[in-house]
Structures are given as structure tokens and as C-alpha cells.
Amino acid sequence: RLELMLVCAHPAIAPAIRTPLMLQTVLGVDADAIAHAFAVAPAAMAQRLVRAKRRIRVARIPFATPERADLAGRLPAVLEAVYGAYAIDWPGHGSPVDSLSGEALHLALVLTELLPDEPEVLGLAALVCLSESRRRARRLDDGTFVPLDEQDTRLWDRPLIDRGEALLQRAHGYGRAGRYQLEAAIQSAHCDRARNGRTDWHALRALHRGLVEIAPSLGAVVALAAVDGEIDGPQVGLAALEAIGDPSADAFQPYWATRAHLHARAGQPKAAAGAYSRAIDLTSDGGLRDYLTACRTQLPARRGP
């Protein structure tokens, strides 16, 4: 599969479509799910994928593993595809065996064997290990979503946490910080709660700020706003969300879920209810929808902003 993914990252293929192409043709992800992950209309994504496949045929791109010297230009798209596959399957609450997230974990670890001296490869593997370690705690028996700060840490997979921490330490040893290392460090900071029973929000803010600086994205900015709200109060977090100028935020579920949480903490039940409703409308996962609906139901019945 890695060989096919490297083919999809050929220089003749437009950079923006390389990762979606890998997700569909190599990892079997549905085009609609890919479109949702990239905040693109399904029809537009389908057209781009068709054009990319046509490009492979017309350009007669060989199905061969590139030389190591050529890997650097293709590696970022491969890493993004592996992480994208994991993120798309993240809501799953069954066994990781034979799942897309299980395949993503396998590919991430295989990459560390092929490229053991690439810090971002190590960082990606650490990120997937640390995220996957909490799988059992993310859902109740009925499938209802459990937010990170409410999870029972006794259900976390300690050996997988230890493996992720070891990979992250190896990555840090190269002294070249990158997106996946920072994202793994964020997950590591959350996993510290299993050891000391608390969340170091100030450490998380420093890491999130670093991530926004080197790999800005809508998700990264929303996550930083959430952390700001935890430290400085909900109004500060809401102001950070208001400052986001990306129009795609209107269709970004985490934006509305975060906004709802901050409005609720600020004592603004009316605004919170509206934001929860928008987040629910944008949620296809039943367990997460049930959780958000319960949060909306528990809001105090009073007037407010």
C-alpha cells in the first residue's frame, strides 16, 4: 500500500489532490467522507479525483517505488493521507482490528521502519499511538461519545501510550520540530492526566500556539480558542472564535461545538442552544449527536444572550 501511495504523490499529480487520491484509491475511503474531511463539496471532490486518475493514465506514471532521494517531495502527502485515514475513522468505537484506523496505525509504524531517521514520520506514529490509546474510553457501551476531559483514564491503553511517548522522544532528538510532532506532543500532554490526574492547560496552549504558527488550519485555530477559553475564561475563547475569518468555519462542526461549550460556560444558554443545534446538524456520528443533544437539553431554561 505504501508503494501505491507514493505513486499517488508523483510530481505530475497536483499537490492538492494527492492525499485525497491516496485515501480513495489505496485506502478505500468513500469520496463523500474525503470531501467532508477536506471541507469540500462532494461533487467537487469527485471531479478532482476523476481528473487525477485520468492524469495518471495520460502521463503513464509508473507504479514503482521512488528512489530515496525523491521521497522527500512525496512524503508529506503520504503522512497526511495516513493521518487523514485515522482521523476519518476516529469516531469508530468498535475494535480497531481490520478498521481504517487500525490500518493507519499499521502504516504509520511501517513508515518508522522504512524511514527511522525522519522526525515527522516518528511524530506521526507517536500521534496515532497516543490518540488510539484512548479508543476504549471514547464511547459508553451504548455508543454515546465521551469527551476527553470526562474519560476514565483506567480504560486508556498504557502500553500504546508508552510506545507513543518513546516515538515522540526519538523524534524530538533530531531537533527539527514539525506539525506531527507538535500534534503528538498535544496528545501526550492530554495523556499525562493518566499519571498525575490533571491537565496542564498552559503547556497545551504553548503547543497549540506552536502548531498554529507552523501549520495553520481551521482545526488548529479552533482548538487554540478552546484552550484560551479554559485558561482565560469563555469570553476570551469566544472572542478568538469570532476573530476567525475563514468562511468554512460556518460548516465546521468543531467550531460550533466549541462555541456552544464556551457560551454555556459564559452563562449564555440561548446562544449555547443555537450553537449546539448547529453542531448537531453538522454531525453525522450518532453517538456524538446524542452527546451534543444531551448537552443542549441540560442547559438552564432561562433567558440570556
State each model region's role.
Residues 120, 183, 219-220, 254, ...:
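Start-of-helix register in tetratricopeptide repeats
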Residues 36-38:
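Alpha-helical residues within the helix-turn-helix
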Residues 98, 132, 195-198, 214, ...:
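Structural motif corresponding to the intra-repeat A-B loop/turn of tetratricopeptide repeats
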Residues 108, 115, 175, 208, ...:
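Alpha-helical junction/boundary sensor with strong preference for TPR arrays
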